[in-house]
């Protein structure tokens, strides 16, 4: 099954959860790249990365909770 067909079968909550998970992965990758750079200028970058990861993790948690709630409600 192609990706477009699979995407059309996902609910909005599933798509949002997947998007938030991907965003968190991207933030983690960016943070890991910042860890590899050792310079005084990178201190602020590391702190910013931590803030972005916290926000992305919260957004993913919210999306997962919404998805769980949606799946509790039986479809008619």
Task: Indicate residue ranges for each PLM-predicted region.
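N-terminal acidic leader/helix
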Residues: 2-38
